[in-house]
Amino acid sequence: VPLSPVCGSDGVTYDSECALKLMRCMIQKDLHVVMLSPCKDASPSSVPELHCSRSVYGCCRDNVTAAQGVGLAGCPSTCECNRYGSYSKTCSPSSGQCSCKPGVGGLKCDRCEPGFWNFRGIVTDEKSGCTPCNCYPLGAVRDDCEQMSGLCSCKAGISGMKCNQCPNGSKLGPSGCDQDPSVSRTCSDLHCQYGATCVQSIGRAYCECPPSICPKNKQFKVCGSDGVTYANECQLKTIACRQGSVINILHQGPCQGTTPSTGNIQTTDLTPSPKEHTNLSKIVSLETIPILKAIFPVTDNTTGPQVHKMYTVTASPGVIGHPTAGWPPSSLTSSEPPDLSGSGDFSGDTDLEASGNLEGSGVEPMGFNESSTGPPTPVPNERSTCDNTEFGCCSDGKTPSVDGEGSNCPPTKLFQGVLIVEEVEGQELFYTPEMDDPKSELFGETARSIENALNELFGNSNVKKDFKSVRVHGLGPSDPVRIIVEVHFDPRTSYNSHDVQRALLQQVKQSRRKSIVVKKPEQDNVKIVDFDWAPLLFTTTSTTAARTTVPITTASALPVTRRPPPATTRWPKVLPHAKVPSTTTKPATTRRPPFSRKVEVRPATVKVHRPCDSQPCLHGGTCEDDGVSYTCSCPAGRGGAVCERTIVYFIPEFGGRSYLAFKTMKAYYTVRISMEFRASNLDGLPLVQWTEKGKGLHFYRPSEGYVELRFNHGVWDGVITSKTLIKPGNWHHVVGNRNRRSGMLSVDGEPHLIGESPPGTDGLNLDTDLFLGGTPEDEMTLVTERTTATKGLQGCIRLLDVNNLIYDLQERSNDVLYGSGVGECGNNPCSPNPCKNRGKCHMKEAEMFHCESVGEFSGPTCADKHNPCDPNPCHQSANCMVLPEGGSKCECPMGREGELCERVSEAEQDQGKAFIPEFNGLSYLEMNGIHTFVSDLLQKLSMEVIFLAKDPNGMIFYNGQKTDGRGDFVSLNLRDGYLEFKYDLGKGAAVLRSKAPIPLNVWNVVTVERNGRKGLMKINKDELVSGESPKSRKAPHTALNLKEAFYVGGAPDFNKFARAAGIISGFTGAIQKLSLKSIPLLKKENIRNAMEISNFRWHACTKTRNPCQNGGVCSPRLREYDCMCQRGFSGPQCEKALEEKSASGSESVAFNGRTFIEYHNTVTRSEKAVQVNYFEMSIKTEATKGLILWSGKIAEKSDYIALAVVDGFVQMTYDLGSKPVTLRSTIPVNTNQWVRIKANRIHGYGTLQVGNEAPVTGSSPFAATQLDTDGALWLGGIEKLAPGNRLPKAYSTGFIGCIKDVVIDRQELQLVEDALNNPTILHCPAKK
């Protein structure tokens, strides 16, 4: 097209004919070129228009339009141009061709041209023309597409709406799907647009649109720049991303403008809406955002003529799209006005008719034959043309409705059904309250998607010959969404509801293309019944009289009964005399024969969700299920409805199932016990007991108001009963002694009562914990067998004296190992009433209560009118937790953040950032057990942790042997600010406790070690704590046996931990380093599961801007950091570029195994006491051993640091006077290629990096931090090592190879000029 000015028929000069056509498209009016030059001064618009009677051919029948030829040629009555597909009512007088909108074809502009679709969008959405199919040529069979959805016909093995997707990340090429290494594997290779975020999964990276869920503070409607009202800001962003378009928020609240109904659109003046200028059909490439688009019409249930709106919905990336199944073709018996004929009618253009049939049907053209493996893919049948009409189809799927009431629709036989659906067209369904409104856009989108999927399944089932259509009647909350549908069949069909249900189930299970996913087991979640049995299943207000019905085409807002909570789900009853309101549908014109046989409707078997399934109890509380609700039994120090409150007690109170545990007491021959208690009732409850595997039981308990002392030496019990009656509510003092087989008991100073056990052994071995007030549930069985007592004390204990040692019973005591259900004596947790909304408070154990709801309120404290987690407001990968104070909290998996876990975390997006996990008290990391990382864990353990704590309580790590509260374990835990390192080897726990509280909000370095029974904990390199586990005379108990997972920062259920660990809360803070024998554990590839983990934002290495330049990797070092520079750069921030020097230059020195060069250990001077070392150098060698660098003293048992090649790998070894530390690289260097080495030491912490490998780290096990040297540094080797160093032979062998670009303490070392001795210095050859 020539780019010269032209004059338009509107009298305006345009820069070119293209500019004129663009304007014509935008204003949606007839505009053509009248002059191939600029318009003259007297524009055509200024000339008065002549009446048609004065034209050459006179007027048309409307007496307004001028005829274009003889015989009313070109007049609207003759042309019959479709008013939606054409620009005007007139046509060419010679050919009769109307002026069509873009993509519209046919003489009358009443159909989409080949390669275009969505004629209906011109009518309902005022689109500027038909939408291009954009079928991908390498994956599609044809260029045209299915007219209702835009779905292209794909070749075998290719999927996607536009046939542009291959499975498993393969690339679509001329020969089909081929594996392509260029497919994005990581997010660094992928650029996401339109608000999408990159997600890595199964070796692929893809773009994921944000969820449509919104926080409460954003739950208000907004008006988009496309003229559409959205439920909230989040829905707008989601739809914009799915459409691949930019939609901005114009203002809060609904859009003011309304879309005119079709009845009000004038042919002569069709005003474009803002939507006309927005390309809603934009296709984003697979490499950018692999999305799948499907079109779902929304029915606008308003008075007057019905308008169908089209909205674009995008499925999840990589989801296979499916064509919409139709029904057998048949001729229409009713005529239709030509302006509503849509794209399926005959247009008069015989050349385009065949193509139009194909584009409407999706059937492959004749002659096409492509071999494929696997079961045949269902091919959609021809769709009826009524889908493109103004009021859509009747329930028979063929007849076009002439009005919104469907007054002309033929009768159908109606079945109703309910399905519990999880996915539709690859999109996971989540219920939202907006789905209750049949007028909402969300209801329309979801319903249309479900109808398309079910139409496809029924259209390929064994009942398809009588099947007509499916209509969605209602959406309701379930697990996740309950769908109520109407299934329409031929009124003369012989199929019953069982046949229909069986056919649908068969398709759901066997269909290869999963257009709809029903919750498993499918047979329990699909139910079809006859229409007159529908109230039993749905309890809707549908009439039960009409068994054959004429459905209307508008959405019917039938109320749907919400299901009660899962624990109380019951099937609704039908009242025999209940009056059911009738619907607005017309009476049926035909009826089926009366229903003659009884149909038994059996409710589907639904998995019963127990109240404790969601693990509602916090901080290690035990959930107890009563079948309707739950209560939490809290550990000592916790209380509240779900153990959310911190309890501080001074005099412990026990509730019958409570207890406190202490260390095992020594009572082999003698023991003296004194205690003071107050009981609230007298039903034979134990006060204190301790056992040894069922033998030897010492036990106090009130029996009918009297205290008993029992002791057993292995055969029979010795029993002494007091004579003083115990009075409820009074304090009593009890003293008991045992000396071998003799015992004594006295209550409140009464005369001593003497007794003895039967003859046997005199000694009593006790090896379990001492329990006060009761026992753990699993220990109570043994107590019941020996004493008939079934519960613990209900009351208070203020004194316990064992062998003249008074135990501290307070909550923060060091004597208490662990406990459960203990509170302050005299406290009433129900005063004041913690239950909201008039809930009734029931006191349970001490400091614990249960709220009984009144009315419709629920939750731990009756704070919520509805379950805030049903439906789940969180992202699909997150867990929803009901809060005791009301509302909910989303527990995000690792990689997601935000109030609703709606965002991908920054650390997940930037894989180059350092990973410093931050914990919030409910977070945890789960890994494989530490026994899987090292082989010699049984006898020895060495771990280092660098952490920053924000709360004085919380678990740092735990690994155990069992999940029943017993067994071996190792743990590190903060308790009241003190750090506790515990391990149990089978005889009892060793407890190593810090001498002072750990400082908060600063980085702490802790090293824990175990060798046999002996343990050591070093804190911040200056505090040393030692201890050992209990010993046994029968077994050594020196091995640590671990079998379970390793948890960091917390766990999903603390009840599975060993009770002796005393862990009841998660860690709050950040963990910078966690290593096991220098093996770093905090790597993402080691993590099996994670919850509520985010990256610590307050360290330089995790901030948005990387402090290391030129691609350097930031390595955290407490508050500071080190930069691991890429090759060719050096400096603290890798800001210096190293010049590449010639290999024959003076700075590339060759070493022959006898060349030993001496330097100052800090380049310019000698330092005798060094806290920090930093080395960088490049080496080239073929040798498998040789000493590269040495700094230290040449004396026995002296400090040193060294670099050497050992077995072809670089090793860094240093000894600060306590124990040598060896770091070994994983990259071989004996390749005769230049390799860069970086090594540093900060106090006892060392790092080694060779090439681009991940740094290898380690630390000195004891408190030494200083390297004492003679001030010298040697390259290439040393004359003689001290005999006591016990280093490998490689350290006493000289280095053979080349060394260059040496950096010492971040200063360049001149290999020749800075040398202190004068050896023969050789140079490397010029050829590298």
Swiss-Prot record:
It holds the Pfam family Kazal_2. Residues 411-533 form the SEA domain. Gene3D superfamilies: 2.60.120.200, 3.30.60.30, Laminin (2.10.25.10), SEA domain (3.30.70.960). Residues 649-825, 914-1096, 1146-1324 form the Laminin G-like domain. GO terms for molecular function: calcium ion binding. Glycans are attached at residues 63, 168, 279, 301, 369. One of its GO terms (biological process) is cell differentiation. GO terms for cellular component: basement membrane; extracellular region. Residues 322-384 are annotated as: Disordered. Residues 1-41, 201-257 form the Kazal-like domain. Residues 608-644, 865-902, 1097-1135 form the EGF-like domain. Disulfide bonds join 7-39, 79-91, 81-98, 100-109, 112-130, 133-145, 135-152, 154-163, 166-177, 207-241, 214-234, 223-255, 612-623, 617-632, 634-643, 796-825, 830-841, 835-851, 869-880, 874-890, 892-901, 1101-1114, 1108-1123, 1125-1134, 1298-1324. Keywords: Developmental protein, Differentiation, Disulfide bond, EGF-like domain, Glycoprotein, Laminin EGF-like domain, Repeat. SMART domains: EGF (SM00181), EGF_CA (SM00179), EGF_Lam (SM00180), FIMAC (SM00057), FOLN (SM00274), KAZAL (SM00280), LamG (SM00282), SEA (SM00200). Residues 79-132, 133-179 form the Laminin EGF-like domain. Plays a central role in the formation and the maintenance of the neuromuscular junction (NMJ), the synapse between motor neuron and skeletal muscle. Ligand of the MUSK signaling complex that induces the phosphorylation of MUSK, the kinase of the complex. The activation of MUSK in myotubes induces the formation of NMJ by regulating different processes including the transcription of specific genes and the clustering of AChR in the postsynaptic membrane. This is Agrin. The gene is AGRN.
